[in-house]
């Protein structure tokens, strides 16, 4: 049912917040109830969720993962854009170049995720056409150190050329 999506989206819209629909997580307990990664194989249901959230006036993000057999992320990005999504948040796994394909396929705001740790990873993703990057779990390093490096790299990327 889309009712919980509508309710959450209405709250997000009222608070100028983003609702992110999880078509990403692969934990068995989420997949068993039809959430997370299972939505990638059920684009009709995912589309209904996006349409319901967008109808409430919320900014809608869809988090997806690369390397799921049978899933064409650029085509899915186009579908999500038509359904009313504003953002696609891509866990690029071991296929960073998928960011380029997704960015070229739609006008969605693209957030790249996976192994964002430093200047090189930020520049790689932004170079592929991502509009932003997100940091998941900083492996063994303290979160603050990773975040400072990523923030500096983004600032450097966005600095005006003199």
Report the location of each language-model feature:
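Active-site entrance/lid segments in N-terminal catalytic domains of soluble metabolic enzymes
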Residues: 1-74, 96
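Catalytic cores of alpha/beta
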Residues: 3-15, 68-80, 104-112, 116-135
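Glycine-rich phosphate-binding active-site loops on the catalytic face of alpha/beta enzymes
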Residues: 15-28, 85-95, 128-150
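C-terminal helical cap(s) of enzyme catalytic domains, especially alpha/beta-barrels
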Residues: 31-34, 101-105, 137-162
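Residue-level signature of transmembrane alpha-helix interfaces in integral membrane proteins
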Residues: 36-38, 79, 152
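Glycine- and other small-residue-rich loops at beta-strand/loop junctions that grip anionic moieties
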Residues: 38, 42, 65, 88-92, ...
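Short loop-to-alpha-helix "cap/lid" segments that border enzyme active sites
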Residues: 45-56, 71-84, 93-107, 116-119
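Short, basic, helix/turn surface patches
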Residues: 48-52, 111-122, 139-144, 158-162
